[in-house]
From Swiss-Prot:
Chloroplast keyword on record: no
Function: Involved in transcriptional activation and repression of select genes by chromatin remodeling (alteration of DNA-nucleosome topology). Component of SWI/SNF chromatin remodeling complexes that carry out key enzymatic activities, changing chromatin structure by altering DNA-histone contacts within a nucleosome in an ATP-dependent manner. Stimulates nuclear receptor mediated transcription. Belongs to the neural progenitors-specific chromatin remodeling complex (npBAF complex) and the neuron-specific chromatin remodeling complex (nBAF complex).
Location of the protein in the cell: Nucleus
Domain SWIB/MDM2: 258-335
Example of a GO biological process term: positive regulation of G2/M transition of mitotic cell cycle
Protein name: SWI/SNF-related matrix-associated actin-dependent regulator of chromatin subfamily D member 3
Keywords carried by this UniProt record: Acetylation, Chromatin regulator, Neurogenesis, Nucleus, Phosphoprotein, Transcription, Transcription regulation
Organism: Mus musculus
Modified residues (Phosphoserine): 178
Family to which the UniProt record says this protein belongs: Belongs to the SMARCD family.
Amino acid sequence: MAADEVAGGARKATKSKLFEFLVHGVRPGMPSGARMPHQGAPMGPPGSPYMGSPAVRPGLAPAGMEPARKRAAPPPGQSQAQGQGQPVPTAPARSRSAKRRKMADKILPQRIRELVPESQAYMDLLAFERKLDQTIMRKRVDIQEALKRPMKQKRKLRLYISNTFNPAKPDAEDSDGSIASWELRVEGKLLDDPSKQKRKFSSFFKSLVIELDKDLYGPDNHLVEWHRTPTTQETDGFQVKRPGDLSVRCTLLLMLDYQPPQFKLDPRLARLLGLHTQSRSAIVQALWQYVKTNRLQDSHDKEYINGDKYFQQIFDCPRLKFSEIPQRLTALLLPPDPIVINHVISVDPSDQKKTACYDIDVEVEEPLKGQMSSFLLSTANQQEISALDSKIHETIESINQLKIQRDFMLSFSRDPKGYVQDLLRSQSRDLKVMTDVAGNPEEERRAEFYHQPWSQEAVSRYFYCKIQQRRQELEQSLVVRNT
Protein backbone atom coordinates (compact mmCIF):
# COMPACT_ATOMS: atom_id res chain seq x y z
CA MET A 1 0.00 0.00 0.00
CA ALA A 2 1.23 3.52 -0.74
CA ALA A 3 0.57 4.95 2.74
CA ASP A 4 2.20 1.96 4.40
CA GLU A 5 5.27 2.22 2.17
CA VAL A 6 5.58 5.96 2.79
CA ALA A 7 5.30 5.58 6.59
CA GLY A 8 7.64 2.59 6.69
CA GLY A 9 10.10 4.24 4.33
CA ALA A 10 10.17 7.41 6.41
CA ARG A 11 10.84 5.47 9.59
CA LYS A 12 13.54 3.37 7.92
CA ALA A 13 15.20 6.48 6.49
CA THR A 14 15.25 8.12 9.90
CA LYS A 15 16.66 4.99 11.55
CA SER A 16 19.32 4.67 8.84
CA LYS A 17 20.39 8.30 9.28
CA LEU A 18 20.60 7.84 13.05
CA PHE A 19 22.72 4.74 12.71
CA GLU A 20 24.94 6.28 10.00
CA PHE A 21 25.53 9.33 12.19
CA LEU A 22 26.40 7.25 15.25
CA VAL A 23 28.72 4.80 13.50
CA HIS A 24 30.43 6.98 10.92
CA GLY A 25 29.83 10.45 12.31
CA VAL A 26 28.19 11.56 9.06
CA ARG A 27 25.94 14.56 9.50
CA PRO A 28 22.80 14.85 7.33
CA GLY A 29 23.82 16.86 4.31
CA MET A 30 27.56 16.01 4.59
CA PRO A 31 29.33 14.02 1.86
CA SER A 32 29.50 10.31 2.41
CA GLY A 33 33.29 10.43 2.89
CA ALA A 34 33.21 13.20 5.51
CA ARG A 35 33.69 12.42 9.20
CA MET A 36 33.16 14.44 12.35
CA PRO A 37 36.30 15.74 14.06
CA HIS A 38 36.74 14.40 17.60
CA GLN A 39 37.75 16.78 20.37
CA GLY A 40 39.45 16.20 23.71
CA ALA A 41 41.94 13.58 24.75
CA PRO A 42 42.01 10.30 22.84
CA MET A 43 39.72 7.65 24.20
CA GLY A 44 41.17 4.45 25.56
CA PRO A 45 40.52 1.13 23.86
CA PRO A 46 37.42 -0.81 24.81
CA GLY A 47 37.95 -3.19 27.67
CA SER A 48 40.86 -1.22 29.17
CA PRO A 49 42.34 -2.92 32.24
CA TYR A 50 42.06 0.36 34.13
CA MET A 51 38.31 0.09 34.04
CA GLY A 52 38.02 -3.02 36.17
CA SER A 53 37.58 -2.85 39.96
CA PRO A 54 39.33 -5.68 41.84
CA ALA A 55 37.05 -7.76 44.00
CA VAL A 56 39.33 -7.37 47.08
CA ARG A 57 42.28 -5.20 48.03
CA PRO A 58 45.74 -6.54 47.17
CA GLY A 59 47.13 -8.50 50.06
CA LEU A 60 43.74 -9.54 51.47
CA ALA A 61 42.23 -12.97 51.03
CA PRO A 62 38.66 -13.11 49.79
CA ALA A 63 36.44 -12.84 52.85
CA GLY A 64 33.44 -15.09 52.97
CA MET A 65 30.01 -13.86 53.97
CA GLU A 66 28.83 -14.64 57.49
CA PRO A 67 26.61 -17.75 57.60
CA ALA A 68 23.83 -15.79 59.29
CA ARG A 69 23.74 -13.34 56.39
CA LYS A 70 23.68 -15.95 53.65
CA ARG A 71 20.42 -16.41 51.77
CA ALA A 72 19.39 -19.62 50.09
CA ALA A 73 19.36 -19.49 46.32
CA PRO A 74 15.90 -19.46 44.71
CA PRO A 75 14.77 -22.77 43.19
CA PRO A 76 15.24 -23.30 39.44
CA GLY A 77 12.68 -21.55 37.26
CA GLN A 78 12.08 -18.87 39.90
CA SER A 79 13.44 -15.39 39.34
CA GLN A 80 15.39 -13.37 41.85
CA ALA A 81 12.38 -11.15 42.35
CA GLN A 82 10.35 -14.19 43.43
CA GLY A 83 13.09 -15.29 45.83
CA GLN A 84 12.93 -11.89 47.51
CA GLY A 85 9.16 -11.98 47.81
CA GLN A 86 8.59 -9.33 45.14
CA PRO A 87 5.92 -9.72 42.44
CA VAL A 88 7.16 -10.83 39.06
CA PRO A 89 6.31 -8.30 36.31
CA THR A 90 3.98 -9.57 33.66
CA ALA A 91 4.90 -9.73 29.97
CA PRO A 92 3.15 -6.41 29.05
CA ALA A 93 4.87 -4.70 31.99
CA ARG A 94 8.26 -6.03 30.89
CA SER A 95 7.55 -4.88 27.35
CA ARG A 96 6.63 -1.37 28.50
CA SER A 97 9.69 -1.09 30.77
CA ALA A 98 11.93 -2.36 27.96
CA LYS A 99 10.46 0.23 25.60
CA ARG A 100 11.03 3.03 28.10
CA ARG A 101 14.58 1.81 28.68
CA LYS A 102 15.30 1.73 24.98
CA MET A 103 13.98 5.24 24.44
CA ALA A 104 16.21 6.50 27.28
CA ASP A 105 19.21 4.62 25.91
CA LYS A 106 18.90 6.44 22.60
CA ILE A 107 19.63 9.85 24.14
CA LEU A 108 23.23 11.02 24.24
CA PRO A 109 24.29 12.41 27.65
CA GLN A 110 24.85 16.14 27.94
CA ARG A 111 28.58 15.71 28.60
CA ILE A 112 29.04 13.88 25.31
CA ARG A 113 27.09 16.57 23.47
CA GLU A 114 29.39 19.18 24.97
CA LEU A 115 32.46 17.26 23.82
CA VAL A 116 31.10 16.66 20.30
CA PRO A 117 28.99 19.63 19.13
CA GLU A 118 28.13 17.78 15.91
CA SER A 119 26.12 15.31 18.00
CA GLN A 120 23.30 17.87 17.97
CA ALA A 121 22.51 16.63 14.46
CA TYR A 122 21.83 13.19 15.95
CA MET A 123 19.57 14.70 18.60
CA ASP A 124 17.67 16.57 15.87
CA LEU A 125 17.16 13.29 14.01
CA LEU A 126 16.00 11.67 17.25
CA ALA A 127 13.45 14.45 17.80
CA PHE A 128 12.27 14.09 14.20
CA GLU A 129 11.89 10.33 14.66
CA ARG A 130 9.83 10.90 17.81
CA LYS A 131 7.52 13.29 15.97
CA LEU A 132 7.24 10.83 13.08
CA ASP A 133 6.33 7.99 15.45
CA GLN A 134 3.71 10.16 17.13
CA THR A 135 2.22 11.14 13.77
CA ILE A 136 2.07 7.52 12.59
CA MET A 137 0.53 6.39 15.88
CA ARG A 138 -2.06 9.17 15.74
CA LYS A 139 -2.90 8.23 12.15
CA ARG A 140 -3.26 4.56 13.13
CA VAL A 141 -5.70 5.52 15.89
CA ASP A 142 -7.69 7.66 13.44
CA ILE A 143 -7.83 4.76 10.97
CA GLN A 144 -8.97 2.34 13.69
CA GLU A 145 -11.77 4.70 14.68
CA ALA A 146 -12.76 5.19 11.03
CA LEU A 147 -12.94 1.43 10.44
CA LYS A 148 -15.44 1.06 13.29
CA ARG A 149 -17.96 3.12 11.33
CA PRO A 150 -19.60 1.95 8.09
CA MET A 151 -17.68 3.29 5.12
CA LYS A 152 -19.95 3.32 2.09
CA GLN A 153 -20.12 5.26 -1.13
CA LYS A 154 -22.93 5.64 -3.65
CA ARG A 155 -22.40 4.00 -7.02
CA LYS A 156 -24.52 3.39 -10.11
CA LEU A 157 -25.52 -0.18 -10.92
CA ARG A 158 -26.74 -0.59 -14.49
CA LEU A 159 -29.33 -3.32 -15.01
CA TYR A 160 -29.63 -5.05 -18.38
CA ILE A 161 -32.98 -6.80 -18.95
CA SER A 162 -33.09 -8.67 -22.23
CA ASN A 163 -35.04 -11.52 -23.78
CA THR A 164 -34.72 -13.87 -26.74
CA PHE A 165 -37.43 -15.84 -28.59
CA ASN A 166 -36.99 -19.32 -29.98
CA PRO A 167 -39.76 -20.18 -32.50
CA ALA A 168 -41.08 -23.70 -32.81
CA LYS A 169 -39.41 -26.09 -35.31
CA PRO A 170 -41.84 -28.68 -36.73
CA ASP A 171 -39.07 -31.02 -37.90
CA ALA A 172 -37.23 -30.99 -34.55
CA GLU A 173 -36.66 -34.40 -33.06
CA ASP A 174 -36.57 -33.35 -29.39
CA SER A 175 -39.55 -31.92 -27.55
CA ASP A 176 -37.75 -28.66 -26.64
CA GLY A 177 -37.27 -27.62 -30.25
CA SER A 178 -40.84 -28.40 -31.27
CA ILE A 179 -42.30 -25.88 -28.78
CA ALA A 180 -41.82 -22.11 -29.01
CA SER A 181 -40.17 -20.55 -25.94
CA TRP A 182 -38.64 -17.35 -24.71
CA GLU A 183 -35.75 -16.65 -22.32
CA LEU A 184 -35.43 -13.64 -20.00
CA ARG A 185 -32.03 -12.45 -18.73
CA VAL A 186 -31.38 -10.04 -15.84
CA GLU A 187 -27.76 -8.88 -15.58
CA GLY A 188 -25.88 -5.82 -14.43
CA LYS A 189 -22.56 -4.18 -13.63
CA LEU A 190 -21.17 -1.20 -11.74
CA LEU A 191 -20.40 1.87 -13.80
CA ASP A 192 -16.84 3.24 -13.57
CA ASP A 193 -15.74 0.52 -11.18
CA PRO A 194 -12.05 1.15 -10.31
CA SER A 195 -11.57 -2.08 -8.38
CA LYS A 196 -9.81 -4.93 -10.13
CA GLN A 197 -11.97 -7.60 -8.48
CA LYS A 198 -15.41 -7.45 -10.08
CA ARG A 199 -18.34 -7.95 -7.75
CA LYS A 200 -20.98 -10.51 -8.64
CA PHE A 201 -24.35 -9.12 -9.71
CA SER A 202 -26.37 -11.16 -7.21
CA SER A 203 -24.31 -9.84 -4.27
CA PHE A 204 -26.17 -6.52 -4.47
CA PHE A 205 -29.59 -8.05 -3.77
CA LYS A 206 -31.32 -9.84 -0.95
CA SER A 207 -34.12 -11.21 -3.13
CA LEU A 208 -35.41 -11.10 -6.71
CA VAL A 209 -39.00 -11.87 -7.74
CA ILE A 210 -40.22 -12.01 -11.35
CA GLU A 211 -44.00 -11.94 -11.65
CA LEU A 212 -45.37 -13.16 -15.00
CA ASP A 213 -48.86 -12.78 -16.41
CA LYS A 214 -51.09 -14.94 -14.23
CA ASP A 215 -53.63 -15.41 -17.03
CA LEU A 216 -51.00 -17.01 -19.29
CA TYR A 217 -49.08 -19.14 -16.77
CA GLY A 218 -51.67 -19.81 -14.08
CA PRO A 219 -51.63 -19.02 -10.37
CA ASP A 220 -49.02 -21.69 -9.55
CA ASN A 221 -46.40 -20.98 -12.21
CA HIS A 222 -46.40 -17.22 -12.63
CA LEU A 223 -43.81 -16.39 -9.92
CA VAL A 224 -40.04 -16.88 -10.17
CA GLU A 225 -38.29 -16.18 -6.85
CA TRP A 226 -34.70 -16.05 -5.64
CA HIS A 227 -33.82 -15.36 -1.99
CA ARG A 228 -30.41 -15.09 -0.40
CA THR A 229 -29.41 -17.80 2.05
CA PRO A 230 -26.20 -18.37 4.04
CA THR A 231 -25.10 -20.94 1.44
CA THR A 232 -25.99 -18.90 -1.64
CA GLN A 233 -23.49 -19.04 -4.51
CA GLU A 234 -23.11 -15.63 -6.12
CA THR A 235 -23.85 -15.34 -9.83
CA ASP A 236 -23.42 -12.78 -12.60
CA GLY A 237 -27.09 -12.84 -13.64
CA PHE A 238 -30.46 -14.60 -13.64
CA GLN A 239 -32.19 -16.49 -16.46
CA VAL A 240 -35.84 -17.50 -16.78
CA LYS A 241 -37.04 -19.74 -19.62
CA ARG A 242 -40.71 -20.47 -20.31
CA PRO A 243 -42.67 -21.91 -23.24
CA GLY A 244 -44.83 -19.48 -25.18
CA ASP A 245 -45.20 -17.56 -28.43
CA LEU A 246 -47.00 -14.49 -27.06
CA SER A 247 -45.58 -11.27 -25.64
CA VAL A 248 -45.68 -11.33 -21.84
CA ARG A 249 -45.87 -8.49 -19.38
CA CYS A 250 -43.77 -9.08 -16.29
CA THR A 251 -42.88 -7.20 -13.11
CA LEU A 252 -39.45 -7.42 -11.48
CA LEU A 253 -39.18 -6.82 -7.72
CA LEU A 254 -35.57 -6.36 -6.57
CA MET A 255 -34.74 -6.00 -2.87
CA LEU A 256 -31.30 -4.49 -2.25
CA ASP A 257 -29.04 -6.10 0.34
CA TYR A 258 -28.22 -3.17 2.63
CA GLN A 259 -25.21 -3.49 4.90
CA PRO A 260 -25.87 -2.42 7.63
CA PRO A 261 -29.62 -3.13 7.30
CA GLN A 262 -31.81 -0.16 6.43
CA PHE A 263 -35.46 0.44 7.23
CA LYS A 264 -38.28 2.50 5.85
CA LEU A 265 -39.61 5.01 8.36
CA ASP A 266 -43.23 5.41 9.37
CA PRO A 267 -44.71 8.30 7.31
CA ARG A 268 -45.17 10.50 10.40
CA LEU A 269 -41.61 9.88 11.61
CA ALA A 270 -40.28 10.33 8.07
CA ARG A 271 -41.87 13.79 7.85
CA LEU A 272 -40.53 14.71 11.29
CA LEU A 273 -36.91 13.71 10.56
CA GLY A 274 -36.81 14.26 6.81
CA LEU A 275 -35.67 10.67 6.17
CA HIS A 276 -37.22 7.93 4.06
CA THR A 277 -34.94 4.90 4.32
CA GLN A 278 -31.94 4.75 6.64
CA SER A 279 -30.04 2.50 9.03
CA ARG A 280 -31.16 2.22 12.63
CA SER A 281 -28.14 4.11 14.01
CA ALA A 282 -28.68 6.98 11.56
CA ILE A 283 -32.36 7.19 12.56
CA VAL A 284 -31.50 7.32 16.28
CA GLN A 285 -28.88 9.99 15.61
CA ALA A 286 -31.35 12.08 13.60
CA LEU A 287 -33.92 11.72 16.38
CA TRP A 288 -31.39 12.88 18.98
CA GLN A 289 -30.52 15.85 16.78
CA TYR A 290 -34.23 16.75 16.65
CA VAL A 291 -34.42 16.53 20.46
CA LYS A 292 -31.42 18.84 20.88
CA THR A 293 -32.60 21.32 18.25
CA ASN A 294 -36.04 21.66 19.84
CA ARG A 295 -34.70 21.47 23.43
CA LEU A 296 -36.91 18.57 24.40
CA GLN A 297 -34.51 17.14 26.97
CA ASP A 298 -35.71 17.61 30.54
CA SER A 299 -33.74 20.38 32.26
CA HIS A 300 -33.79 18.63 35.67
CA ASP A 301 -33.56 14.98 34.70
CA LYS A 302 -31.45 14.66 31.55
CA GLU A 303 -32.50 11.04 31.12
CA TYR A 304 -36.04 12.03 30.13
CA ILE A 305 -37.40 13.70 27.00
CA ASN A 306 -40.45 15.95 27.11
CA GLY A 307 -42.17 15.45 23.78
CA ASP A 308 -43.75 18.19 21.70
CA LYS A 309 -47.06 17.60 19.92
CA TYR A 310 -45.43 15.78 16.97
CA PHE A 311 -43.31 13.67 19.29
CA GLN A 312 -46.35 12.73 21.34
CA GLN A 313 -48.35 11.77 18.26
CA ILE A 314 -45.61 9.45 17.02
CA PHE A 315 -44.61 7.78 20.31
CA ASP A 316 -48.04 8.09 21.97
CA CYS A 317 -46.69 9.38 25.29
CA PRO A 318 -45.91 12.85 26.65
CA ARG A 319 -42.63 11.87 28.33
CA LEU A 320 -40.20 8.99 27.93
CA LYS A 321 -36.63 7.96 28.63
CA PHE A 322 -34.14 8.27 25.83
CA SER A 323 -33.07 4.67 26.48
CA GLU A 324 -36.63 3.58 25.53
CA ILE A 325 -36.45 5.09 22.05
CA PRO A 326 -34.71 2.12 20.31
CA GLN A 327 -37.41 -0.23 21.60
CA ARG A 328 -40.25 2.10 20.58
CA LEU A 329 -38.68 2.59 17.15
CA THR A 330 -39.17 -1.08 16.32
CA ALA A 331 -42.87 -0.57 15.64
CA LEU A 332 -42.14 2.48 13.46
CA LEU A 333 -39.56 0.83 11.18
CA LEU A 334 -40.69 -1.11 8.12
CA PRO A 335 -38.83 -3.14 5.49
CA PRO A 336 -37.50 -0.94 2.67
CA ASP A 337 -39.46 -0.68 -0.55
CA PRO A 338 -38.29 -2.98 -3.36
CA ILE A 339 -37.22 -1.69 -6.75
CA VAL A 340 -40.14 -2.28 -9.14
CA ILE A 341 -39.49 -2.60 -12.89
CA ASN A 342 -42.21 -3.32 -15.46
CA HIS A 343 -40.96 -5.06 -18.58
CA VAL A 344 -42.53 -6.57 -21.70
CA ILE A 345 -41.09 -9.82 -23.01
CA SER A 346 -41.53 -9.37 -26.75
CA VAL A 347 -41.65 -12.32 -29.15
CA ASP A 348 -42.09 -10.13 -32.27
CA PRO A 349 -39.09 -10.73 -34.60
CA SER A 350 -39.39 -7.19 -35.98
CA ASP A 351 -39.08 -5.64 -32.50
CA GLN A 352 -35.47 -4.53 -32.09
CA LYS A 353 -35.85 -3.15 -28.55
CA LYS A 354 -35.37 -6.39 -26.68
CA THR A 355 -32.85 -4.99 -24.15
CA ALA A 356 -33.78 -2.42 -21.51
CA CYS A 357 -31.27 -0.58 -19.25
CA TYR A 358 -31.97 0.85 -15.81
CA ASP A 359 -29.59 2.66 -13.44
CA ILE A 360 -30.11 2.22 -9.72
CA ASP A 361 -28.17 3.60 -6.74
CA VAL A 362 -26.32 1.07 -4.61
CA GLU A 363 -23.91 1.36 -1.69
CA VAL A 364 -20.52 -0.30 -1.98
CA GLU A 365 -17.57 -0.55 0.36
CA GLU A 366 -15.16 2.35 0.34
CA PRO A 367 -12.07 1.22 -1.65
CA LEU A 368 -9.81 2.84 0.94
CA LYS A 369 -11.17 0.53 3.65
CA GLY A 370 -9.11 -2.41 2.40
CA GLN A 371 -6.00 -0.27 2.15
CA MET A 372 -6.58 1.08 5.66
CA SER A 373 -6.92 -2.45 7.05
CA SER A 374 -3.76 -3.51 5.23
CA PHE A 375 -1.92 -0.54 6.72
CA LEU A 376 -2.91 -1.56 10.25
CA LEU A 377 -1.94 -5.21 9.71
CA SER A 378 1.25 -4.55 7.79
CA THR A 379 4.50 -5.61 9.48
CA ALA A 380 6.71 -5.49 6.40
CA ASN A 381 9.25 -3.01 7.77
CA GLN A 382 9.07 -3.82 11.48
CA GLN A 383 11.97 -6.28 11.44
CA GLU A 384 14.28 -3.88 9.63
CA ILE A 385 13.29 -1.02 11.95
CA SER A 386 13.89 -3.23 15.01
CA ALA A 387 17.32 -4.21 13.66
CA LEU A 388 18.25 -0.55 13.17
CA ASP A 389 17.01 0.23 16.69
CA SER A 390 19.21 -2.51 18.12
CA LYS A 391 22.24 -1.16 16.27
CA ILE A 392 21.56 2.36 17.54
CA HIS A 393 21.26 1.12 21.14
CA GLU A 394 24.49 -0.86 20.87
CA THR A 395 26.30 2.15 19.40
CA ILE A 396 25.03 4.48 22.13
CA GLU A 397 26.11 1.99 24.79
CA SER A 398 29.56 1.78 23.20
CA ILE A 399 29.79 5.59 23.15
CA ASN A 400 28.91 5.74 26.86
CA GLN A 401 31.58 3.17 27.68
CA LEU A 402 34.16 5.09 25.67
CA LYS A 403 33.16 8.27 27.50
CA ILE A 404 33.82 6.58 30.86
CA GLN A 405 37.21 5.38 29.63
CA ARG A 406 38.03 8.85 28.34
CA ASP A 407 37.15 10.43 31.70
CA PHE A 408 39.35 7.86 33.45
CA MET A 409 42.32 8.53 31.20
CA LEU A 410 41.84 12.31 31.30
CA SER A 411 41.62 12.44 35.12
CA PHE A 412 44.62 10.15 35.46
CA SER A 413 46.68 12.30 33.08
CA ARG A 414 45.89 15.50 35.02
CA ASP A 415 46.55 14.21 38.58
CA PRO A 416 47.84 10.61 38.67
CA LYS A 417 48.42 10.52 42.45
CA GLY A 418 45.12 12.09 43.48
CA TYR A 419 43.17 9.96 41.04
CA VAL A 420 44.75 6.71 42.27
CA GLN A 421 43.95 7.69 45.87
CA ASP A 422 40.35 8.46 44.96
CA LEU A 423 40.13 5.15 43.11
CA LEU A 424 41.46 3.24 46.13
CA ARG A 425 39.01 4.98 48.45
CA SER A 426 36.17 4.14 46.11
CA GLN A 427 37.23 0.52 45.83
CA SER A 428 37.61 0.33 49.60
CA ARG A 429 34.00 1.38 50.01
CA ASP A 430 33.00 -1.21 47.43
CA LEU A 431 34.97 -3.84 49.32
CA LYS A 432 33.06 -3.10 52.52
CA VAL A 433 29.77 -3.45 50.75
CA MET A 434 30.78 -6.72 49.09
CA THR A 435 32.24 -8.34 52.24
CA ASP A 436 29.65 -6.95 54.72
CA VAL A 437 32.43 -5.55 56.93
CA ALA A 438 31.26 -2.86 59.39
CA GLY A 439 33.53 -0.02 60.47
CA ASN A 440 36.92 0.99 59.14
CA PRO A 441 39.65 -1.63 59.73
CA GLU A 442 42.39 0.86 58.85
CA GLU A 443 41.35 3.23 61.66
CA GLU A 444 40.44 0.53 64.16
CA ARG A 445 43.93 -0.96 64.14
CA ARG A 446 45.42 2.27 65.58
CA ALA A 447 45.42 3.12 69.34
CA GLU A 448 44.24 6.68 68.78
CA PHE A 449 40.90 5.30 67.65
CA TYR A 450 40.11 4.11 71.22
CA HIS A 451 41.11 7.34 73.03
CA GLN A 452 38.13 9.24 71.70
CA PRO A 453 35.37 10.50 74.12
CA TRP A 454 32.85 7.89 73.07
CA SER A 455 35.03 4.96 74.20
CA GLN A 456 34.32 5.47 77.96
CA GLU A 457 30.58 5.36 77.43
CA ALA A 458 30.92 2.35 75.15
CA VAL A 459 32.87 0.43 77.82
CA SER A 460 30.27 1.27 80.48
CA ARG A 461 27.45 0.11 78.23
CA TYR A 462 29.32 -3.09 77.41
CA PHE A 463 29.88 -4.05 81.06
CA TYR A 464 26.31 -3.11 81.99
CA CYS A 465 24.93 -5.40 79.27
CA LYS A 466 27.22 -8.24 80.38
CA ILE A 467 26.14 -7.85 84.05
CA GLN A 468 22.47 -7.90 83.09
CA GLN A 469 23.00 -10.97 80.93
CA ARG A 470 24.83 -12.78 83.76
CA ARG A 471 22.12 -11.83 86.29
CA GLN A 472 19.40 -13.32 84.07
CA GLU A 473 21.38 -16.55 83.70
CA LEU A 474 21.79 -16.87 87.49
CA GLU A 475 18.10 -16.19 88.14
CA GLN A 476 17.10 -18.84 85.61
CA SER A 477 19.46 -21.41 87.17
CA LEU A 478 18.03 -20.71 90.68
CA VAL A 479 14.48 -21.12 89.43
CA VAL A 480 15.35 -24.44 87.80
CA ARG A 481 17.10 -25.68 90.98
CA ASN A 482 14.15 -24.75 93.24
CA THR A 483 11.64 -26.56 91.03
